[in-house]
Amino acid sequence: MSEKSNMSRRSFLKATGGAASASVIAGTAAGQETTTQQGGGGGGSGGTLNLINTGTMSTLDPIKATDTASGRVIQQMFDALMNYPDGAIEVQTQLATGYERSDDFTTYTFNLKEGAPFHGDFGEVTAQDFIYSWERLAASDNSRRAYFILDSIGIQHETDSEGNYKPGTLAVEAVDDYTLRVTLEEPFHATLPILAYTSFAALPEGILGDIQGYDGEMEYQTFATQNPIGAGPFQFETWQSNDEAEVSRFPNYHGETAQVEAVNWRIIEDDNAIYTYAMNRNADYFPIPTPFYDPNKVSVENTDDKGRETGTYGPVRNGATVNYLGVATINAFYIGFNTNRVEKPARQAAAYAMNQQQVIEQIFKGRGQAAYHFTPPNIYPGGPDAYTQHAEQNYPYGYNQTQIQQARQVMEDAGYGPNNQYEFTFTIYSGSDTWNQTAQLLRDQLASAHISMNIESAPFSTLLQRGREGNLQAYSLGWVMDWPAPDNFLQLLNPPQTDTSQDAPISYVNWSGTPAANRAASAYEQIEDNPAPTDEAEAARNESYVQMEEANWEDVVFLPVYHETDERFWYQNVDISKFGAAGPSRQMYNTTSIN
């Protein structure tokens, strides 16, 4: 759900007079542990795995997709050097067979699989294909993830006088056809995990002409909507906007050939339609929307060493008892406030009124954890216990409380009252009954604090577009990890990246010009200045992460609401692996079978 800018963030800060950097940063070095994914075998059981995609898709281009709905499909068609197997957070090699890392953590040399074919007649994957694909990520006007390669991982490159990336200068070298050497500006604690993200996937060199030096072998819109070419276990079949998408088994896949013949996603955003589709057995593996979910029907039979719960659920409406999986994935769902359009007292009043625990229990039926930080508990500095302790002791708007009197007082102090009410609009994404209920509860509470809050809904893709254009006041969104460390989340609260007047901001809050915003910007610079996978750098990062959380508390830019427990249900004919903390959107289906 983030966006890109082709301007280096460091250069942007210099150009705009950003806060001076200090010395602090961190991350989860454990996230760089890897294993090797074995290829060969597979294929056979056939049939179509029928799924539900609960959001509108926007594109099939890996560097342009910023929404989970598109990402679910892209994950099946495009392979990268690394991968999160079944959404676990220990990365594996994928198109790489192994790698070497320099002692100073700045040079990575990857050995590629030989003979790994692209779909169609585009030959095998080579190092030159990765150079081309990563140049697109950095330089293409279609890229919304340029900051991943230019800033987050920080591959060496040159910039022009305005701080923009100078095309063709990435320090990515093809030593030979099957050896790729990558040089970073400085060490980064999550290099291997970020390379598992599909924005770094391989495309055939020259397939598109959206960067310098290439005319392209097909039109961009054809690739992005009708004929995406990758090296994944499935190849594209169809995508009908707001209807369905389908991929089919790629028989020459370099890894384990898919068991199923095809995977089909019906695109449905409405909760009632989702549940009806699943109850009619049109979906094999599916979510159950909260309005139709009964926690008393869950029977947990096993909890593994990663805390994943498995068992059964039912009976459901059609009389069946289905399989159950519940995983505390790494995510955060929140209300974002455009600070240019919603005054601070109103934002604070919303925080006073919001009782996150009440929302989880009464609206979400216990399917998650109340959120008081944007950083999820399982990657918060010090872990879940530290998360809870910091929130209990320091959250300024009432931990597990609704404080209407304080909400009313902050608005009266700002000059509002019964005859002078403040008004703003909260936009939620269409089809979400739970967000609609949350919005209604907040609206009713704020009515007692001299605030008239309007509620509107918009399709997910429309909400994102309006956000990028700065045309939202308050909005509901969520963020699911790209790599398992706090900086992947807190980049959304880095003030320079929230400016909607810039090219594709990462969030839509326009946070600047306040003491808290300045502290957050300074803290994020400290994070950037301490990127190494060392204990010292991690301690520095951890300090800055907490500073950013507290700065957000002060200005209420994001109002955290909940951390979701991802649950999936499936009929007895499906044999599917458990997904991990990276979530089901990172799971590949080539090992899934239909009986």
Question: Which residues does each predicted region cover?
Answer:
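Extracytoplasmic/peripheral linker and loop segments enriched in polar/acidic and small residues
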Residues: 12-13, 100-101, 170-173, 398-400, ...
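Ligand/substrate-recognition segments at binding pockets and active sites
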Residues: 17, 241, 398-404, 408-482, ...
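N-terminal lobe/hinge region of extracytoplasmic solute-binding protein
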Residues: 52-101, 229-230
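Gly/Pro-rich hinge or "lid" segments in bacterial periplasmic/extracellular proteins
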Residues: 85-86, 187-188, 195-264, 272-273
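Surface-exposed binding/hinge segments that line
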Residues: 129, 147-211
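Append "and occasionally in soluble cytosolic enzymes with long acidic Gly/Pro-rich linkers
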Residues: 343-444, 547, 593-594
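Long beta-strand-rich cores associated with HINT superfamily self-processing modules
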Residues: 447, 568-595
